[in-house]
Every structure is written in structure tokens, then in C-alpha cells.
């Protein structure tokens, strides 16, 4: 057991554990989860399928609604929205392994040596979107993040922060969204995506304003813009051009998938 003197946030805490590990893989599991008995074995089997796999995301099912999915791997979109693939849909689905944009670090396994190449979880994030960020860096470097449907874990959700939306979470997520794009997108990619990202931020502001968190969202955006320069930006390398192009396509398809799943959830609610 490792004890820390201060609250370093999720990123700082897991980095201590990852650096202390002597194993080829590290498994992260939130304190509000309950894995099934085959979970670890299936995660190890999945990551051992290829040395190019950086992370494996598990099949996360809602703890108190076991017929519904919580997360089948994390995705990212042109709008700058990170989202849980499959959330709210039937847990009987999502039964096929596939590539995802990033593993959800609430229940994921990582290849430890790759952290040495791409960097660890960004401690400037403190919490929220740090798993998307490290998965993004892995994709830039040419590694894969995959989903394993056979590794099942039950998840409460917001077990530490206490609620789905609160001032702390909204502010940090808004700030970290700025960091995420600034760090990982070269200037040209940022320029290409500035309009959809701006549109996504506008929609999010209106969404949170309606729920009483508009000021918190704006505070996070302002903090992100003011401090993004302190982040360690991923340097552009010509040999990674094909990876950036593949990522741009993933952002496009991730946007389509978001609206497809959103539409299905709305239809299911009306039944």
C-alpha cells in the first residue's frame, strides 16, 4: 500500500503506483467498481494479443442497473466531446472486441513500458479527461487502445466526486478539454477543427447554464486558455502524419457515433 501526504488527484496518484510497479502491465480500477471473477484474466489475455496495444478498456456495466451499459471504451469527437461508448444502452450488446479512442481508466489495463515513451498521466489535469489524453498520445505514437467485452466490471459512477454534475467536475473538465486539444493537436489540426470545437463548447456552455453550472464551465475554459501554455505539448513528427490523419478520421466517425447512440437512447426513452 502506498500512502500520499497530499491529494494529488487521480493523475498524480496513479502515476505513483505505475512508477512503483515492476510488472509489464498495470491495471487501474476505481474504488466504486466490482469486477467479475474473470476480469483480470481477460484483460491480460486482451493486452497480450499484440505489442502495439497500449491499453484495454473493459465492459463497464451500471452497478444498480445491470441491464444497462456504463462504458464500452471512451471516444472523442470533432466537437471536442469525450464520451462513453454505449452508455445507457443494453448491456446485452457490445459483445465484440474493437479499437476505441481511449480506455476508460476506471477499469483498464496498460502496457507499462509505453508510458516511458509517451509520458504518464498528465498531472496538470488532476482529474477528468486524463485517460483520453494519455490514450490520444498513444494513438499519435502509433499504438492502439482496444475494448474487451469479456472483461466485465460493475460501476457505480461518480463514487468519489459524489454526483454526475457539480461545480468542481464541470470546471475541471472544461479546463482539461482545453489542455487536451492544445497538447495533442498540431497547429494545422487545431486550425481545421477550431469551428467544430467552438460549436461544441457553445453547446456545452448552454447545457451547463441550463443546469446552473454555466459560470463554472466558463471559469474552467478561461483557466484552460490562461494555463495551457504550461502543458507539455506533443511535438509534431513527420513520421506520425499518417497517425494524425487516422485520428482525424476517428474524430469524424466518433462524432457520427455520438449522435447515432444519442438518437437511439432518445428513442428507447420514448418506448
Where are these regions (language model features)?
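A recurrent flexible, glycine/aromatic-enriched loop bordering the glycosyltransferase active site
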Residues: 69, 82, 89-110, 127, ...
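Hydrophobic/aromatic residue at the end of a short beta strand that borders the catalytic acidic motif
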Residues: 10, 29, 33-39, 110, ...
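Glycine-rich, basic loop-to-helix element that forms the pyrophosphate-binding segment
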Residues: 3-21, 31, 42
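Short aromatic/hydrophobic "clamp" motif used to bind/position activated sugar donors
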Residues: 26
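A short, conserved alpha-helix in the catalytic core of glycosyltransferases
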Residues: 101-152
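Non-catalytic, C-terminal membrane-associated alpha-helical segments of glycosyltransferases
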Residues: 190-271
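Conserved donor NDP-sugar-binding/catalytic core segment of glycosyltransferases
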Residues: 33-77
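Active-site donor/metal-binding and catalytic loop motifs
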Residues: 141-166, 176, 180
Amino acid at each position: 500500500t502506498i500512502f500520499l501526504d497530499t491529494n494529488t488527484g487521480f493523475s498524480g496518484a496513479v502515476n505513483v503506483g505505475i512508477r512503483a510497479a515492476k510488472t509489464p502491465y498495470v491495471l487501474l480500477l476505481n474504488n466504486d467498481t466490482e469486477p467479475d471473477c474473470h476480469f483480470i484474466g481477460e484483460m491480460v489475455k486482451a493486452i497480450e494479443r499484440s505489442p502495439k496495444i497500449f491499453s484495454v478498456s473493459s465492459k463497464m456495466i451500471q452497478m444498480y442497473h445491470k441491464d444497462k451499459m456504463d462504458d464500452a471504451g471512451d471516444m472523442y469527437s470533432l466537437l471536442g466531446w469525450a464520451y462513453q461508448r454505449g452508455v445507457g444502452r443494453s448491456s446485452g450488446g457490445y459483445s465484440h472486441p474493437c479499437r476505441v479512442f481511449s480506455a476508460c481508466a476506471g477499469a483498464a489495463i496498460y502496457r507499462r513500458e509505453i508510458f516511458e515513451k509517451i509520458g504518464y498521466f498528465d498531472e496538470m489535469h488532476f482529474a477528468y479527461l486524463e485517460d483520453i489524453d494519455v490514450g490520444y498520445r498513444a494513438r499519435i505514437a502509433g499504438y492502439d487502445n482496444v475494448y474487451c467485452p469479456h472483461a466485465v466490471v460493475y460501476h457505480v459512477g461518480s463514487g468519489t466526486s459524489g454526483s454526475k454534475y457539480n461545480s468542481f467536475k464541470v470546471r475541471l473538465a472544461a479546463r482539461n478539454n482545453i489542455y487536451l486539444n492544445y497538447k495533442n493537436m498540431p497547429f494545422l489540426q487545431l486550425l481545421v477543427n477550431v469551428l467544430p470545437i467552438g460549436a461544441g463548447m457553445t453547446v456545452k456552455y448552454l447545457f451547463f447554464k441550463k443546469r446552473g453550472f454555466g459560470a463554472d464551465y466558463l471559469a474552467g475554459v478561461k483557466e484552460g486558455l490562461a494555463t495551457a501554455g504550461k502543458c507539455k505539448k506533443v511535438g509534431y513528427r513527420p513520421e506520425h502524419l499518417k497517425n494524425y490523419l487516422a485520428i482525424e478520421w476517428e474524430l469524424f466517425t466518433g462524432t457520427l457515433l455520438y449522435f447515432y447512440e444519442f438518437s437511439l437512447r432518445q428513442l428507447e426513452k420514448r418506448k
